[in-house]
C-alpha cells in the first residue's frame, strides 16, 4: 500500500472517531432513550468485525511513521546513525547496574552509532503490563492491598528510555547515581556526598572509587544531567551508572514518542522532531563526559 493511501486511511479513521462519533452520540442522547438503546445494541455487532481492520490501519501508520519520519530525523542528525525499530537493550545489559528491580520488559526502537569517538545505543525499554488476580474476593482490605500493589509496581518498575555509551577508557571503579525517586536501597558501593547541594538533593551517589567519581561527576556534567532531566519533564526520574567501560543513563517515565494508541493524538512530524531534539540533548552528555575523561587521565 502506498504512503498516500496509508495516511488517508488513518486520517479518515481519526476523523470519524474524533469528530463524527461524538456528535452522533450527542444527537442520540438528546433523542429518545429507545433510539439510544437500539443503536448501542447494534453498534457492537457492526464494530466488532471491523476491529481487526482498525488495528491493521493503525499498525500501517505506525510503520509508516517509523520508517519515514523517524528514520529521516535520525539520518538528519548523522547519516551514519542506524535506526532499528525491532531492536533494543537486552535484559542482561539493562540490569547490570542493579538500580532497578527485575521485571518483564522488551527493548525496541534502537538508535545506534558513533558520536565523538564514542559508540552509543539509545532505545526504549517498555515494561510488560502485569495482571492482578482478585480471586473473587470482596474483602475491602484485600482490595486495598491490591490497589497498593498496583501503585507500588507502577512507581518502582522501569519503563522509559535508556542510553548506553561505550568509552575508549575503562573505569577503575563503579559509580552509580540513583534518582531519589528510586527506592532501591541495595545498590553496591559506599554512599558519597558531593559539594553540589542541589545535586545531592536530587540524587544518591554510590561508588567504590571516590577519587574517580569526583572526576567523572564534574560540575559541567552534573549541570548537564539536570538539564536533561528538566528537558524530559518533571515526571521523569533520571539515574546513571559508570561501570567497566560503559556509561548508562536511565530515564524512567520518559514519553514514548515512537508509539501511539487508538485514543492518543496521532503521531506526526512534530513528534519525530521532538525525538531529534531529545537525541541531540543526550549526545551533549557524551561531549561533557569526554571533557571529564580528558582531565582524568
Where on the chain are the PLM-derived regions?
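Hydrophobic or amphipathic, alpha-helical segments that drive membrane association/targeting
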Residues: 10, 36, 44-47
